[in-house]
């Protein structure tokens, strides 16, 4: 779908795009193809798409994969997509009555994606997330999907450049923080490419980037320690320039923290931004959940 087609559809239907919903639609065909290539799709793949908009990426996903679940919050766009795919389904049936329409592989859901993910007890481990995520909810959606063995096997997400850089960051990087660690606990960053702002309509104020994340083959932590990891990370970065040990004293006894820091060869003066993911994992394993001053 080209830019002039997008404009024509929106004008014809009287749809004014809403900034609060992060509605910036990717129209550049070269960038769309790069996203599809990065997803490494096969006809057996199941794909979750969040925020399909007018459906340019959806069309390519249906060509390459076996099943697509597209979740759209804006009812005006859902109405357009249903009409569009119903018309294509009828046209396809007329041309090839014995060949299944690709539309039959599409499930279009009118819902708030973040609410859906929070309440949907689905195992996503056989799915891939391939989406141009709305800026306003991209980070919480990724954290919600980082759920251990139920997490998607691959994420190919187009995001605001700043968010993408956080996902790819390493310790001692300005972009390194809570989002980095909560997502990288389950996913290994593979690659990133920049998508200029003028590839979207309307053009956002900043560039975007597409990141590729693969789910880790082996979990870094057992499920029963995930909540403790989250607590440690959030507490450690609550004041990122402050010494970690002082912050963690709010949750664990000082004597235990000093002993664990010494065992792991972490300086008592160290700040959270200096610790690697592996060090946070080791810290989580070494601190006794039973000695917590408050509940997880």
What feature does the model see in each segment?
Residues 1-234, 262, 273, 277, ...:
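Catalytic cores of RNA-modifying enzymes
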Residues 249-250:
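Short helix-coil junctions and helix-kink-helix linkers
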Residues 256:
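Short, well-ordered alpha-helical segments
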Residues 259-268:
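Short helix/strand-capping connector loops at secondary-structure junctions
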């Amino acid at each position: 779908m080209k830019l002039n087609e997008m404009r024509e559809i929106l004008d014809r239907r009287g749809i004014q795009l809403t900034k609060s919903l992060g509605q910036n639609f990717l129209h550049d065909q070269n960038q769309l193809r790069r996203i599809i290539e990065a997803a490494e799709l096969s006809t057996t793949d199941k794909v979750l798409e969040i925020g399909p908009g007018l459906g340019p990426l959806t069309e390519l996903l249906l060509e390459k994969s076996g099943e697509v679940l597209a979740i759209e919050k804006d009812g005006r766009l859902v109405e357009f997509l249903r009409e569009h795919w119903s018309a294509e389904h009828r046209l396809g049936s007329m041309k090839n009555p014995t060949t299944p329409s690709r539309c039959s592989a599409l499930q279009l859901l009118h819902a708030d994606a973040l609410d859906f993910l929070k309440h949907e007890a689905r195992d996503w481990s056989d799915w891939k997330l391939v989406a141009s995520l709305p800026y306003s909810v991209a980070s919480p959606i990724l954290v919600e999907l980082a759920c251990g063995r139920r997490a998607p096997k691959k994420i190919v997400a187009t995001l605001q450049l700043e968010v993408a850089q956080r996902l790819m960051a390493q310790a001692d990087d300005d972009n390194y923080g809570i989002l980095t660690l909560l997502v990288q606990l389950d996913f290994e960053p593979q690659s990133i490419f920049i998508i200029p702002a003028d590839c979207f309509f309307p053009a956002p104020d900043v560039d975007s980037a597409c990141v590729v994340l693969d789910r880790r083959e082996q979990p870094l932590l057992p499920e029963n320690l995930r909540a403790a990891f989250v607590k440690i990370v959030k507490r450690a970065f609550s004041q990122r320039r402050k010494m970690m040990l002082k912050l963690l004293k709010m949750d664990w006894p000082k004597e235990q923290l000093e002993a664990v820091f010494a065992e792991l060869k972490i300086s008592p003066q160290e700040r959270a931004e200096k610790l690697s993911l592996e060090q946070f994992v080791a810290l989580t394993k070494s601190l006794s959940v039973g000695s917590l001053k408050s509940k997880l």
